[in-house]
């Protein structure tokens, strides 16, 4: 009876559930809702079994699933079409995993979320070469780093060995603007140094200390793509990636060159602001030094016009060059070349006066020598007077002898006395004195 009623009302049924009820089910007096409930119980058992199997998976799968992350084994790659990482240039699965590291996956599958790191970047095993990332990964660039400073150090002198007590390494922040790339690359280089990769960083001469391996190149490529999204890269970085999308080493080398150039620019500005010149060095050398600094700054985009350059040069002049500050202040359109013409004129005048001073000194010395020779020639004259005096004394003695002989008697005794008295008495002394008769 019931089956007849069901057959009568089958033409007005509007659901597949009513039409699927059979006579066997009607004879058992079983409600169709009970069948659905039984099926629901089976589904619950199946889900419970799946959950129990899921708890036996490795600890890495216990990380909360990232809704933006696609599994590297099942999901399809969707790389940006307009960025510097084109799909046709992406690494294949074998190229991205040269050593069988399944946790890397395809580079295009790497999430860009700054708040959660996928377990695929955790190296397998406790003896992994690269460190794990803490939960603070992807913090903004303005967040202070726990490491001491973010200045770049030469990788050739930096110690790239990380101690076993340092379990975590702070990753670089997310790049959020092309203008922040110079500061971001400093933190990225610091991150590589703390990750035992200081030897692959290009040195000052542009070459690394050691050769980079395939695994390290993969790690370098993936981490660079994670923390430096393509839309925030500078134009010169995009140009390098458009030629070779894996040439991260060239980007690092160019960045280091720009760091050195920035340091040179700062040094040039400080040198130009602290110029000092007093003529102690050649004017040509001073002009070459100043013009090279100005040209280097202009080539690097720091324009130094003639007015500013002349003011900086004149401020450092001293000595005889100082008056150029007052004679040249009236010339508003004075150039650096005109200022150096005046400096050269003063320098040449100084050199001319210095060359004339040694000749004057030689004349003074000649006069001194002449005076010394004159005093030496007077000594023979003084010595020549002594024989003249002796001759005069002898003449006086002779005259006295004549007078005495004319007055004496012709006796022999008197003659002997007179002869004895007329003979001069020679004294053995250094003054060569002679005593006249009658004085003793």
UniProtKB/Swiss-Prot annotation:
Keywords: Cytoplasm, Phosphoprotein, RNA-binding, Transposable element. The modification Phosphoserine is found at residue 416. Induction: Ty1-GR1 is a highly expressed element. Induced under amino acid starvation conditions by GCN4. Residues 1-93, 126-173, 352-440 are annotated as: Disordered. Residues 48-60, 71-93, 127-152, 419-428 have a biased composition (Polar residues). It is found in: Cytoplasm. InterPro entries: TYA. The C-terminal RNA-binding region of CA is sufficient for all its nucleocapsid-like chaperone activities. Homotrimer. Capsid protein (CA) is the structural component of the virus-like particle (VLP), forming the shell that encapsulates the retrotransposons dimeric RNA genome. The particles are assembled from trimer-clustered units and there are holes in the capsid shells that allow for the diffusion of macromolecules. CA also has nucleocapsid-like chaperone activity, promoting primer tRNA(i)-Met annealing to the multipartite primer-binding site (PBS), dimerization of Ty1 RNA and initiation of reverse transcription. Retrotransposons are mobile genetic entities that are able to replicate via an RNA intermediate and a reverse transcription step. In contrast to retroviruses, retrotransposons are non-infectious, lack an envelope and remain intracellular. Ty1 retrotransposons belong to the copia elements (pseudoviridae). This is Transposon Ty1-GR1 Gag polyprotein.
């Amino acid at each position: 009876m019931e089956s007849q009623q069901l057959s009568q009302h089958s033409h007005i049924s509007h659901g597949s559930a009513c039409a699927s009820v059979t006579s066997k089910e009607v004879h058992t007096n079983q409600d169709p809702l009970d069948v659905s409930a039984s099926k629901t119980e089976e589904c619950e058992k199946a889900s419970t079994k799946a959950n129990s199997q899921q708890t036996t998976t490795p600890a890495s799968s216990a990380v909360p699933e990232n809704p933006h992350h696609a599994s590297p084994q099942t999901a399809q790659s969707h790389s940006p079409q307009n960025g510097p990482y084109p799909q046709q240039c992406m690494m294949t699965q074998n190229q991205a995993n040269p050593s069988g590291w399944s946790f890397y996956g395809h580079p295009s599958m790497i999430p860009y979320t700054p708040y959660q790191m996928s377990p695929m970047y955790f190296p397998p095993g406790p003896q992994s070469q690269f460190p794990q990332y803490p939960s603070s990964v992807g913090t903004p660039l303005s967040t202070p780093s726990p490491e001491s400073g973010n200045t770049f150090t030469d990788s050739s002198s930096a110690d790239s060995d990380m101690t076993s007590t340092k379990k975590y390494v702070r990753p670089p922040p997310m790049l959020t603007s092309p203008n922040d790339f110079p500061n971001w690359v400093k933190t990225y280089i610091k991150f590589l140094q703390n990750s035992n990769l200081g030897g692959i960083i290009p040195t000052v001469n542009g070459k690394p200390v050691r050769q980079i391996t395939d695994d390290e190149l993969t790690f370098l490529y993936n981490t660079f793509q994670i923390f430096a999204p393509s839309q925030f890269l500078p134009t010169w970085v995009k140009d390098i990636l458009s030629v070779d999308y894996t040439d991260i080493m060239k980007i690092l080398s160019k960045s280091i060159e720009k760091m050195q150039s920035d340091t040179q620019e700062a040094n040039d500005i400080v040198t130009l602001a602290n110029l000092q010149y007093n003529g102690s060095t050649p004017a040509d050398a001073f002009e070459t030094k100043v013009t090279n600094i100005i040209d280097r700054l202009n080539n690097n985009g720091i324009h130094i016009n003639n007015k500013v350059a002349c003011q900086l040069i004149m401020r450092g002049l001293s000595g005889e060059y100082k008056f150029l500050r007052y004679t040249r202040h009236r010339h508003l359109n004075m150039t650096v070349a005109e200022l150096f013409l005046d400096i050269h004129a003063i320098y040449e005048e100084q050199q001319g006066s210095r060359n004339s001073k040694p000749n004057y000194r030689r004349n003074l010395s000649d006069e001194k020598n002449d005076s010394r020779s004159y005093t030496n020639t007077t000594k023979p004259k003084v010595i020549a007077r002594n024989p003249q005096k002796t001759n005069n004394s002898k003449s006086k003695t002779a005259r006295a002898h004549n007078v005495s002989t004319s007055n004496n008697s012709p006796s022999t005794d008197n003659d002997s006395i007179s002869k004895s008295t007329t003979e001069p008495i020679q004294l053995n002394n250094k003054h060569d004195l002679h005593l006249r008769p009658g004085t003793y």
